[in-house]
Amino acid sequence: MTPDWLLWQIADSAFPAGGFAHSAGLEAAWQAGQVRDGDSLPEFLAVGLSAAARGVGIFAAVTARTPQRFGEVDAACDLFLNNHVANRASVAQGQAFLRVANEIFGSAALERLGKLVRRERLFGHYSPVFGACTAALGIDPPAACRLFMFMFLRGLVSSAVRLGIVGPLEGQSLQCRLSPRAEELAGILHAASMEDVVQTLPLHDLLQGAHDRLYSRLFQS
């Protein structure tokens, strides 16, 4: 299978990695009134994209370039995700993504990664797993960074639609308008190193940490 086909298959919403069970803090922000309606949603998505490109996305970029650093990057990701909701969601998504990728693609490199996570009792966070999996499948790092940002944006937009903040057509229009920004951030992500990791959205982090205390919730995080 060519790298392009692999990209399309992983980007397909039918790829069963469990990402749609998570809202990346949007549900908590919605209930807290930080996102009030469709008019305030674009700003939330834009700052969320920037935060991902300067935070968790860097872990994916580093393991996409240097998968042999997976253990080190995975441990750093665990330290970075210091709110328990985001940390738990990242581990759940990462282990699900690795398991599904192994079952679907049957790559020897993916199998070795799965054994490493189990043998060393690593966390298996989503971002480093994502990058290492793309490297194992022969997807070049710039394409992996673009795929990461696309999937992050698509996940946020999908969450907004399911929460009823916007409708499906408005959601797709919003995704289209934000795509150039996501593309720009993917370029920044590709050039980033571990020393560049930073939390640019502490309020978002606090809101996401309160997700477990919501009276009613649609998403796991």
Where are the language model's segments positioned?
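Metal- and O2-centered redox machinery and metal/ROS homeostasis
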Residues: 1-221
